[in-house]
A protein has these predicted regions:
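Small/polar-residue-rich segments within soluble enzyme cores
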Residues: 1-68
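N-terminal leader/targeting segments and the immediately adjacent pre-domain N-terminus
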Residues: 40-43, 67-91, 126, 447, ...
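Short, charged, low-complexity patches
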Residues: 28, 76, 80, 298, ...
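Beta-lactamase-like hydrolase cores
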Residues: 81-109, 129
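Short, gly/Ser/Thr-rich active-site loops of penicillin-recognizing serine hydrolases
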Residues: 326-333, 426-455
Length: 455
C-alpha cells in the first residue's frame, strides 16, 4: 500500500499563517481546509480473490486512484517572511517605548498585503503564531496549552481579529461626506479646540486648528473636523458607504473570516436597546464606538481607494493544476466599480499622501527619505481601558501613489499609536520594491513565484 503525501513547497517557517494538514491528508485549517476538494483527489479501489490459505488467486482494479491537484497560492515567500519578522520585531520594539500612555503591553497583531490590481494576497501574518505540527504529533498537553494561551495564537487575526479602525476610518467618512454633498474638497471648516455636540463636550487632538479643508484634516488626523463633518453627513450615510466598501460582511477570501460590525442605529438598538444620538455619530466618525473591522477588510478598503473605486475579491488561491498540467481553476478576474466620483477620490488621496509626505503628516517621520510616494492613514483606537492598557495602533497604506501596486493594513494590539505600526509597512515595501540592497540582484517581484501545495 502506498501512502499519500502532501507537502507545502518552500512554506516551512510560515505554515501557521496559512495551512494545517491532519491525518489521512485532510486539511483542517486555513487554505488547505478551504481547498480540500481540490487537493484531496479520489481513492482507488482494488479487489483481491484469495483461497482458503489466504493466497491471492486473482485481483482487479475496480476504480483507479485519481491524484489530488496541485494548488498554487498567491503568497510570495520572501514578502511573507519579511511580514512575519517585521511584525514580531516591531511589536517587541513598541513594548519598550517610554511614554505615559504605553503600558508595555503590545502583544499581538496582524498584517495583510494585497495586490490592488487583482486582489491577490501577497503576504498575511498573524502574531503570535504557532507551529501546526503540534496537532500532527497529537500531544494533548501541548494542544491544550495552545488553546488556553491568553494571547490566542490559534486565531488568525488577519481575518478573524476585530478591531476598532480609529482614524483609518476617516477617509471613508470623507467619501461619505463628499458624495453626499455635505462638503467639497475645498470646503473649510472651523476647528476649535473644544465644542459641544449633542450635549457632550468634545476636544480636538490637534488643538485649535482654525479653518481647515479635508486634505489638512486627513494630514493631521483632526478629530474635531471629522466630529463635525460626520454629524453633518449623518450616521445613515456613513453606514451606507461603509457597506458599499464591504464592511460588516465577509470579503470572500477562501479561508475563515469574521464580519466585524458597523456602528449604526440598528446595532445600538439591537445590542443595547438604546436610541442613537449626535454624540454617537461623532464618535463613530473617528472609527470608534461599535465599529470593528478585520485587517483583511481594511486592506480591501484601502485597495479600493488606491485603484479608483475598483473592488476585487481578496484571494489566496492563484490556480489549481491537475496531473496533466491543465489549469482547472483560477479565481475570477472581474471587479465591482464603486460609484465614487474621481474628483472626490482624488481629494481623499491627496489627504492620504499628505499623511506620509508632508511635514505635519502623522506618519511622515516613519517614511522620511523614502524613495517614492506612499499614501496612508494612521489610526489609534481606544479599547476603553486606557487607564491600564495601551490603545491599539493601526496603519493602512498603498504605493506607489501615482500607479498603485500594493496595499497594506497592519494592526498591533496595544500598539499605543498608529504611527508606531508604520515601520512594518515600510519594511514590507522595501522588500516588495527590492529596495533592500541585499536583494537588488533578484529584480522586481514576480507574482508567478507563487507558493505551491503539491501531492
Amino acid at each position: 500500500q502506498e501512502e499519500m503525501e502532501r507537502y507545502n513547497k518552500e512554506l516551512e517557517g510560515v505554515e501557521g499563517s496559512v495551512p494545517y494538514t491532519a491525518s489521512d491528508i485532510v486539511g483542517k485549517m486555513g487554505i488547505e481546509a478551504a481547498a480540500e476538494p481540490i487537493l484531496r483527489g479520489i481513492r482507488g479501489e482494488t479487489f483481491r480473490e484469495v483461497d482458503e490459505n489466504g493466497k491471492t488467486t486473482a485481483s482487479y482494479v475496480e476504480r483507479p486512484a485519481v491524484p489530488g491537484q496541485d494548488l498554487y497560492l498567491t503568497i510570495d515567500l520572501d514578502l511573507q517572511k519579511v511580514a512575519v519578522e517585521s511584525l514580531e520585531r516591531n511589536i517587541k520594539r513598541i513594548r519598550q517605548i517610554e511614554h505615559k500612555k504605553n503600558f508595555g503591553d503590545a502583544n499581538a497583531g496582524a498584517v495583510v498585503v494585497m495586490d490592488v490590481n487583482n486582489g491577490e494576497i501577497l503576504a498575511m501574518a498573524s502574531y503570535p503564531d504557532f507551529d501546526p505540527r503540534v496537532f500532527l504529533e497529537n500531544n494533548v498537553a501541548a494542544i491544550n496549552e495552545l488553546w488556553n494561551n491568553p494571547n490566542a495564537p490559534v486565531v488568525n487575526r488577519a481575518t478573524s481579529g476585530n478591531y476598532a479602525p480609529g482614524s483609518t476610518y476617516k477617509p471613508l467618512v470623507a467619501i461619505a461626506a463628499l458624495e453626499s454633498g455635505v462638503i467639497t474638497p475645498n470646503t473649510r471648516i472651523n476647528v476649535p479646540y473644544k465644542e459641544e455636540i449633542g450635549n457632550m463636550i468634545f476636544t480636538n487632538n490637534g488643538g485649535n486648528q482654525g479653518r481647515i479643508n479635508l486634505e489638512h484634516a486627513l494630514e493631521t488626523s483632526s478629530n474635531m473636523f471629522f466630529y463635525k463633518v460626520g454629524v453633518q453627513t449623518g450616521i445613515d450615510n456613513i453606514v451606507k458607504w461603509a457597506k458599499i466598501f464591504g464592511f460588516g460582511r465577509k470579503t470572500g477570501i477562501e479561508i475563515g473570516e469574521t464580519i466585524g460590525s458597523i456602528a449604526s442605529k440598528e446595532y445600538k438598538r439591537q445590542y443595547f436597546g438604546e436610541d442613537w444620538y449626535p454624540a454617537n455619530t461623532a464618535m463613530a466618525s473617528i472609527g470608534q464606538l461599535y465599529n470593528a473591522f478585520t485587517p483583511i477588510q481594511l486592506v480591501n478598503y484601502v485597495s479600493i481607494i488606491a485603484n479608483d473605486g475598483k473592488k476585487f475579491t481578496p484571494h489566496l488561491i492563484k490556480m489549481a493544476v491537475d496531473e496533466s498540467g491543465t489549469i482547472t481553476y483560477e479565481p475570477p478576474k472581474d471587479y465591482e466599480q464603486l460609484p465614487i466620483s474621481q474628483k472626490n477620490l482624488d481629494a481623499v488621496k491627496r489627504g492620504m499622501i499628505a499623511v506620509v509626505n508632508s511635514e505635519d503628516g502623522t506618519a511622515a517621520e516613519q517614511f522620511k527619505d523614502f524613495p517614492f510616494d506612499v499614501a496612508g492613514k494612521t489610526g489609534t483606537s481606544e479599547t476603553g481601558r486606557e487607564a491600564t492598557e495601551s490603545s491599539n495602533g493601526l496603519f493602512v497604506c498603498y504605493a506607489p501613489y501615482e500607479k498603485p501596486e500594493i496595499a497594506i493594513a497592519v494592526v498591533v494590539e496595544h500598539g499605543v499609536w498608529g504611527r508606531e505600526t508604520a515601520p512594518i509597512c515600510r519594511d514590507i515595501m522595501m522588500e516588495y520594491f527590492r529596495l533592500n540592497k541585499e536583494r537588488q540582484n533578484k529584480g522586481a517581484y514576480n507574482s508567478e513565484d507563487a507558493i505551491e501545495i503539491i501531492w
